[in-house]
Each structure stands twice: as C-alpha cells, then as structure tokens.
C-alpha cells in the first residue's frame, strides 16, 4: 500500500481541496495556495517511497520511476501556479475544479508510468484522457473551446476503443497482459505472431494520439486554439512528458528491438510528424495553433530517441521533451504577462512591436524561440545535437537528416515571432501588473535555457 502512497496522496489532496472549495466559498485562492504547497511536499514523498525497486501486482516502483513522477508533478505545479496568477491578472474568480482536474489527470499519469500490465496502463491513461477533455472545454461560454473539446472527446473515445480492442488481441494471442510475458512471447516465437503485433499496434495508437504524433494529430491545432491557455501549458508540458515516459517504458519492456514495430512503425511516424509539424505551422497566424504544430514537430524528434532503443537514445528523448516543455511554458507565460485576458487569442498581430515597451518579455520570448530553433549555446541546441548525434551513431541517417531539414524549416516561423516583436509596427498594449509567480517561472525558464547545457554537460 505504501508503494501507492504518491497516487493516494494526490487523490486525497484533489478531493479534499475540492470539498473545502465548495463548503468555504470565496476562499479558492487561499485553498489553491495550500494545495500547491502540499503538491510541492508530495514531490519529496514520491522520492521517499521510490527507493524500493520491484514490481508489486503489476505496479512497479523504483528510483527512476520516482524521478519521472516528480518531474511530471513539478511541471503540473507550474501549470497550477500559471492558472492561479492568470485568474488574478484577468480579475476572474479562480475555479478550483481546474486544479482538481489537473491533479486527477496526474494521478492517471502516475498509474500509467508505474504500470506493468496493459489493462492497468489503459485505466491510468483513460483517467488522464477524461480529465483532459474537461480541461480542454473549461471555457464554458466559448464556442471554440466547446468545439475543440468535443473533437478531442470524439477522437479520444475512438482511439480508446481501438486501444481496448488491441488489449483483447494481446490477451487472445499472448495469453497474458503482463509486460514480461508479452516480451517473452515476442522474443521466443519462431514465427511472426501477427495477432500479437496487431494488438500492440492498436494499443500504441492511444499513446501516439496523446503524444500528438502523425497520423493521430488532427485534434491538436483546434484543441490548443480553443482551450484556455493554462490548460494548454499542462497539455504541452506535464501531460506530454508523462506520455513520453510511458512510451519509453513500453519500448524498453516490450517492443525492444522487435523490428516490425520498433523500426517500421515508429520510424514512419517520426518522419511524418517532423514533416507535417514543420510545414503545417508556416501559414498559421494564431500563436497557439503555431505551438500546436510545433508540438507535433518536436514529438517527431522525441520519437527518434525512442526508435534508437538504447540508453543514450532514451536519455536524449527524455532530455529533449524536458527542454521543449520548459520553452513552451516560458512562451505561454510571457503571452499571459503581456496580453492578460487576450492571451487566448494571441496572434502575430497582438505581439507586433512589443519590444519597444516590453523589452524583458520580448527578450524572454526571443530566447525561447532561439532555443527551439537550436541556436548555440542555448539548451535547445544541446538537446538537438545530442539527439541527432545518437541517431547518426546508430546509422539512422534518414532520421537525422530529416530532423536537421525540418529544424531549418521550423526556424522560419520561430524567427517570424521574433520579427513581429522587434521589426513590425508597434501596437498599443495595456500594461498589466507584474505577478511574482509568473515572473519567477520566466526567470527560471531563461536560466534553464541559457545555463542548462552547461549544467547537463557536467
């Protein structure tokens, strides 16, 4: 039971917080501050009960799992701080349901990360999915938000059905739902077990959907555009990191070097994601839609590391998604500080000439964009270099060249953001009050992007 303590603790924090938010009205900000502090303490709790290495009833624990969960929880706390300060900035009542949904979503991610059984993994991912649909449609009076959430729900439900169908194939042809049993079947079967492969591919469709990779990416631009910007920070950072860790677990524990799945399927998805993400963003005017295509592109890069199936490849994939998540949070936080209520409608027009009166925000956004391009000595360069270097070492030249090519294409729209801020005609923007939570997040982002490569190299 102690192994489940991080999950139980977060669930209790979410439910008790919601309970007190209902019975003590008009105190949501105070309650949210207490919840954020409790979540910070939960990070240490997650470390404490991850010292035991092993598997208990399909639920694994260990140091690496504890670190993974702590990283996801840290980015979740940042998303909660962003929502809290955003509600203050736009003078809107803080809806505690947002924090409850995010925490329950993280519980699902925690379960998925520790799962060593397909059915348990499915349950964890579904808890994350159901709460994500609600987060996407959190702006109740906004048509675009409702439209995006409905698309997300319909497509997500379809993919969940495919995933469950895949589990039935896995059990039927593999005789078990345990990861180690399926790995044994794949490695010791004299012929190709087509039914088992179909089952695994169908199950993987759910993970690729949540990662926003091609061809299960169609929901991403509409959902990002319609969702509240605080929800988008969660989707881009904590949620994506969690799903990448789940995919890495499956790659290490099941797929391995099994050629038909690992090489053919994931390689094609990686290439298509890079190409579609790079070229799809070129004509976008909405900054949230641009970041949606950027997410698709960067998930393609992450899949390169997954495909390599070695420790260095996995490290490169995890490091890259962390760098991208930090940059994305910095970008969205700057939009909130700059535009306030209009951050959800951010476009190239809304940031024209802001460098004249908002030098600090323009500088932070520029650093984020340069890091995403991969300009040295920023951390984004280190992440891309490490990823492509590992691909070339494994003689995956097509993936490396495709990654470099799409990085050059993506530089066009990243630099377009910088151009709009520094070289376009100035528009008047109402100066908003500085909030210390958002300011601290941005300084941490800049520090990581500027100095992260030096820290990581040691």
From Swiss-Prot:
Signal peptide: none annotated. The chain crosses the membrane at residues 4-24, 30-50, 62-82, 94-114, 118-138, 153-173, 194-214, 235-255, 261-281, 290-310, 318-338, 361-381, 397-417, 438-458. One of its GO terms (cellular component) is plasma membrane. Pfam families: Proton_antipo_M. The keyword Cell membrane applies. It is a multi-pass membrane protein. Its EC number is 7.1.1.-. One of its GO terms (biological process) is ATP synthesis coupled electron transport. Keywords: Cell inner membrane, Cell membrane, Membrane, NAD, Quinone, Translocase, Transmembrane, Transmembrane helix, Transport, Ubiquinone. InterPro entries: NADH-Q_OxRdtase_suN/2, ND/Mrp_TM. PANTHER family: NADH DEHYDROGENASE. NDH-1 shuttles electrons from NADH, via FMN and iron-sulfur (Fe-S) centers, to quinones in the respiratory chain. The immediate electron acceptor for the enzyme in this species is believed to be ubiquinone. Couples the redox reaction to proton translocation (for every two electrons transferred, four hydrogen ions are translocated across the cytoplasmic membrane), and thus conserves the redox energy in a proton gradient. NCBIfam families: NDH_I_N, PRK05777.2-5. Belongs to the complex I subunit 2 family. NDH-1 is composed of 14 different subunits. Subunits NuoA, H, J, K, L, M, N constitute the membrane sector of the complex. This is NADH-quinone oxidoreductase subunit N.
């Amino acid at each position: 039971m102690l192994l489940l303590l991080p999950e139980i603790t977060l669930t209790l924090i979410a439910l008790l917080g919601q309970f007190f938010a209902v019975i003590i009205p008009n105190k949501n900000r105070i309650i949210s501050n207490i919840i954020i502090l409790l979540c910070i303490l939960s990070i240490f709790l997650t470390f404490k009960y991850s010292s035991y290495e092993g598997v208990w009833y399909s639920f694994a624990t260990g140091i690496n799992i504890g670190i993974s969960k702590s990283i996801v929880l840290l980015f979740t706390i940042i998303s909660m701080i962003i929502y809290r300060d955003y509600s203050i900035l736009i003078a809107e009542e803080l809806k505690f349901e947002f924090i409850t949904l995010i925490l329950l979503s993280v519980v699902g991610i925690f379960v998925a990360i520790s799962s060593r059984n397909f059915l348990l993994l499915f349950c964890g991912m579904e808890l994350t999915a159901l709460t994500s649909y609600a987060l996407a449609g959190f702006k109740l009076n906004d048509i675009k938000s409702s439209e995006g959430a409905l698309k997300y729900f319909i497509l997500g439900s379809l993919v969940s059905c495919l995933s469950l169908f895949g589990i039935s194939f896995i059990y039927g042809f593999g005789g078990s739902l345990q990861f180690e049993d399926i790995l044994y079947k794949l490695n010791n079967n004299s012929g190709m077990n087509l039914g088992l492969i179909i089952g695994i591919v169908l199950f993987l469709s759910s993970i690729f959907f949540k990662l926003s990779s091609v061809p299960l990416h169609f929901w991403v631009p509409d959902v990002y555009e319609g969702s509240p910007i605080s929800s988008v920070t969660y989707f881009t950072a904590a949620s994506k990191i969690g799903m990448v860790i789940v995919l890495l677990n499956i790659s290490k524990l099941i797929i391995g070097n099994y050629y038909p799945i690992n090489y053919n399927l994931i390689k094609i998805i990686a290439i298509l994601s890079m190409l579609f993400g790079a070229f799809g963003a070129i004509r976008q005017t909405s900054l949230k839609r641009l970041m949606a295509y950027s997410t698709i592109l960067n998930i393609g890069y992450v899949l390169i590391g997954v495909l390599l199936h070695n420790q260095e490849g996995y490290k490169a994939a995890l490091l890259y998604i962390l760098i991208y998540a930090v940059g994305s949070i910095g970008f969205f936080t700057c939009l909130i500080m700059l535009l306030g209520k209009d951050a959800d409608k951010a476009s190239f027009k809304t940031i024209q000439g802001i460098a004249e009166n908002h030098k600090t925000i323009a500088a932070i956004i520029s650093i984020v964009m340069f890091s995403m391009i991969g300009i040295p000595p920023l951390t984004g360069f280190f992440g891309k270099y490490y990823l492509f270097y590992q691909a070339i070492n494994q003689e995956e030249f097509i993936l490396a060249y495709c990654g470099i090519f799409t990085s050059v294409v993506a530089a066009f729209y990243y630099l377009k953001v910088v151009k709009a801020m520094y070289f376009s005609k100035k528009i008047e923007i109402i100066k908003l009050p500085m909030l210390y939570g958002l300011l601290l997040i941005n300084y941490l982002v800049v520090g990581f992007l500027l100095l992260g490569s030096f820290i990581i190299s040691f």
